Amino acid sequence: MSDVAAILKVMPESPEIDLEALKETIKNTIDADSFERIEEEPIGFGLIALNVTIVVDDGEGGTEPAEEALAALDEIQSVEVTDVRRLM
């Protein structure tokens, strides 16, 4: 099996959420071997999505454990996989 890089779009619960604290929570929630980076994406009305890049095995489950772990956080409204690319 090979690895894939996936981008998860994480939508905070509200614009009032402390993004720096949320970024730290996300880093601590995702397996350190999988985590790559977090980028901010302005959505509108003060809401900023976080695009979280992870690298996972393309086997069974893939991004699902990370998606479920992030979705379980109170500060997060939704988690969506927006891109998946096989690494060479």
Swiss-Prot record:
Keywords: Elongation factor, Protein biosynthesis. Promotes the exchange of GDP for GTP in EF-1-alpha/GDP, thus allowing the regeneration of EF-1-alpha/GTP that could then be used to form the ternary complex EF-1-alpha/GTP/AAtRNA. This is Elongation factor 1-beta. It holds the Pfam family EF1_GNE. CDD domains: EF1B. PANTHER family: ELONGATION FACTOR 1-BETA (PTHR39647:SF1). The keyword DNA-binding does not apply. HAMAP family: EF1_beta (MF_00043). The lineage of its organism: Archaea, Methanobacteriati, Methanobacteriota, Methanomada group, Methanobacteria. One of its GO terms (molecular function) is translation elongation factor activity. Belongs to the EF-1-beta/EF-1-delta family. The keyword Chloroplast does not apply. It comes from the Archaea. The gene is ef1b.
